[in-house]
Structures are given as structure tokens and as C-alpha cells.
UniProtKB/Swiss-Prot annotation:
Source organism, top-level taxon: Bacteria
PANTHER family per the UniProt record, alphabetical: BIFUNCTIONAL TH2 PROTEIN, SI:CH1073-67J19.1-RELATED
Homology family: Belongs to the TenA family.
GO MF annotation terms: thiaminase activity
Coiled coil: none
Active-site residues from the entry: 137 (nucleophile), 208 (proton donor)
Function of the molecule: Catalyzes an amino-pyrimidine hydrolysis reaction at the C5' of the pyrimidine moiety of thiamine compounds, a reaction that is part of a thiamine salvage pathway. Thus, catalyzes the conversion of 4-amino-5-aminomethyl-2-methylpyrimidine to 4-amino-5-hydroxymethyl-2-methylpyrimidine (HMP). Is also able to catalyze the hydrolytic cleavage of thiamine; however, this thiaminase activity may not be physiologically relevant. Therefore, is probably involved in the regeneration of the thiamine pyrimidine from thiamine degraded products present in the environment, rather than in thiamine degradation.
Name this protein carries in UniProt: Aminopyrimidine aminohydrolase
Chain sites annotated for binding substrate: 44, 141, 167
Pfam families xref list: TENA_THI-4
Residue numbers marked as site, Increases nucleophilicity of active site Cys: 47
Gene for this chain: tenA
Enzyme class (EC, first level): hydrolase
Length: 229
């Protein structure tokens, strides 16, 4: 078994939890609240901006121009391609996407997730540590998208079904390339290093769960009482 496959299989129970949580289940049914959609889109807009910055930080750590080209292409996709999925949700609540994301949010779960990735980008020379922190994002979306398209509970009459349809295919290439990078970059890693890399991957998968739930519960920073909000 390749190391990348080991990581993906280890994360499956967490992804099952994500799928069965309120955010995805309500989205499947086409009844996710407007508040949850807005919070998700606003937080994800901030998240994707940082995600592209981390891609850029990985470029000097790549040894081949092919890998550099891949990272540049992913930056372009994050800036333009993934907006398509966001606009599906904006259409669902009948609000312009650009108007929704004018209000910036930085909830605790998104903050912790981003800092997890930045720490590995700054502290680890081997890009495998950072990729392990980033790779669960497309993998989680790919698994959820594919599973939803086979789920009889999917409300195909709702525009939200297009969100699942998008992620059921659009993440495949990114997942494959991340797997190839992971296997190549960990080829000479010690077992201790591989254990840390695996923990990075699983921690980010948990961060993905918290991110969806953050939108579902309208998570905010609590500073202690109304006077500090």
C-alpha cells in the first residue's frame, strides 16, 4: 500500500462523520439555512485566499518545473475555478456571491485550520508536511461529492445538487497529484517523520469537519460577555 493511500484510508472514519453531520445532510436535502450558507461562503473565501498563499510558499521547495507548474495552475483554480461551486450556493439563497463575501469573517475553526497549514509551511523544509496539511481539503470534497451523487437522499430538484456534482469530479486531478507528490516526497522519510506527516493529514481532516460545522452553528469568537463581543 502506498503511503498516500494509507493516509486516505485512515481518514475515512472522519469523512464519514463529516458526511453525516448537519451541514452536509441539510445540503443534501436542499434545506441548508441561509445563515449557514453565508457563513460558509464568507469563511471559505478567506480560507481559499490563504490556501493560495501557501501554494506559493511551496514553489521554492519543489525540485521540478512540472511540480511548480502544477502549483501555479492550482493557484489559478483557487482564484477562479472554485468560484463556480460557491456561486451555486449563492444562487440557492438568491443572493449575489460578490455581495455575500463583501463581509469578511475569520471564525475560530478557520483560524486554527489556516495556522496549522502555515506552521508546516514555515517550520518544515520537506514540502510533504505542508502537503499533508493541505491534501485533505480536496480529498474530503471529492469523497463527499461522489458519495452524494450515489445517495438516494440527494435532492436532485435543488440547485444544491450541482454543488455535489461539481466536487464529484473537479477535485480528482488535484487528489491524484497530491498523492504522487506525497509518495515521492516521503520516499526517504523516517518512520517518525511519516508518523508526524500522517498526524498532519488526519488533523486537517478534523479541521475540515470543524470548518463545515463552524458554518452550521454560526461559530464566532467568544471573548466573555456581551461587552466584549
Amino acid at each position: 500500500m502506498t503511503f498516500s493511500k494509507e493516509l486516505r484510508e485512515a481518514s475515512r472514519p472522519i469523512i464519514d462523520d463529516i458526511y453525516n453531520d448537519g451541514f452536509i445532510q441539510d445540503l443534501l436535502a436542499g434545506k441548508l439555512s441561509n445563515q449557514a450558507v453565508r457563513q460558509y461562503l464568507r469563511a471559505d473565501a478567506s480560507y481559499l485566499k490563504e490556501f493560495t498563499n501557501i501554494y506559493a510558499m511551496l514553489i521554492p521547495k519543489m525540485s521540478s518545473m512540472e511540480d511548480v507548474k502544477f502549483l501555479v495552475e492550482q493557484i489559478e483554480f483557487m482564484l477562479e475555478g472554485e468560484v463556480e461551486a460557491h456561486e451555486v450556493l449563492a444562487d440557492f439563497i438568491n443572493e449575489p456571491y460578490e455581495e455575500i463575501v463583501k463581509e469578511k469573517v475569520w471564525p475560530p475553526s478557520g483560524d486554527h485550520y489556516i495556522k496549522h497549514m502555515y506552521f508546516n509551511a514555515f517550520a518544515r523544509e520537506n514540502a510533504a508536511f505542508t502537503i499533508a496539511a493541505m491534501a485533505p481539503c480536496p480529498y474530503v470534497y471529492a469523497v463527499i461529492g461522489k458519495r452524494a451523487m450515489e445517495d438516494p437522499k440527494l435532492n436532485k430538484e435543488s440547485v444544491t445538487s450541482k454543488w455535489f456534482q461539481f466536487y464529484s469530479t473537479e477535485m480528482d486531478e488535484l487528489v491524484d497529484v497530491f498523492d504522487q507528490l506525497m509518495d515521492r516526497l516521503t520516499k526517504h522519510c523516517s518512520e517518525t517523520e511519516k508518523k508526524e506527516i500522517k498526524e498532519n493529514f488526519l488533523q486537517s481532516t478534523i479541521h475540515e469537519r470543524h470548518f463545515f460545522n463552524m458554518a452550521y452553528i454560526n461559530e464566532k469568537w467568544e471573548y466573555g460577555g456581551n461587552n466584549n463581543e
